[in-house]
From Swiss-Prot:
Residues engaged in binding [4Fe-4S] cluster 2: 21, 48, 51, 54
Domain of life: Eukaryota
Record function comment: Apoprotein for the two 4Fe-4S centers FA and FB of photosystem I (PSI); essential for photochemical activity. FB is the terminal electron acceptor of PSI, donating electrons to ferredoxin. The C-terminus interacts with PsaA/B/D and helps assemble the protein into the PSI complex. Required for binding of PsaD and PsaE to PSI. PSI is a plastocyanin/cytochrome c6-ferredoxin oxidoreductase, converting photonic excitation into a charge separation, which transfers an electron from the donor P700 chlorophyll pair to the spectroscopically characterized acceptors A0, A1, FX, FA and FB in turn.
Membrane topology: Peripheral membrane protein
Keyword field contains Oxidoreductase: yes
Entries under SUPFAM superfamilies matching the protein: 4Fe-4S ferredoxins
Organism: Cyanidium caldarium
Name of the gene this protein is made from: psaC
Name under which the protein is recorded: Photosystem I iron-sulfur center
Amino acid sequence: MVHVVKIYDTCIGCTQCVRACPCDVLEMVPWDGCKASQIASSPRTEDCIGCKRCETACPTDFLSIRVYLGAETSRSMGLTY
C-alpha cells in the first residue's frame, strides 16, 4: 500500500524525522527557508511502511511532517466529496 509523506514549510531542518525513519524514506535537501538551510524530503515514499515514527520525532508544535496512510490519504487531504 502506498502512503503519502507530506513535508510542510514549518520544517526547522533538525533531521529528527530522517534519523527516526527505519526505512530510509527521508533525506535532507538544501533549503533557504530556515536557519538550518535544509528541509526534509521524501524521495522514497514507496518504501514507507506507515509507522509514523517521523511524525513522533518532529519537535515542532505543528507537525512539519505527516504520513497519510493508504485509504486515509484522499479523505485527510480533502480530496473526497
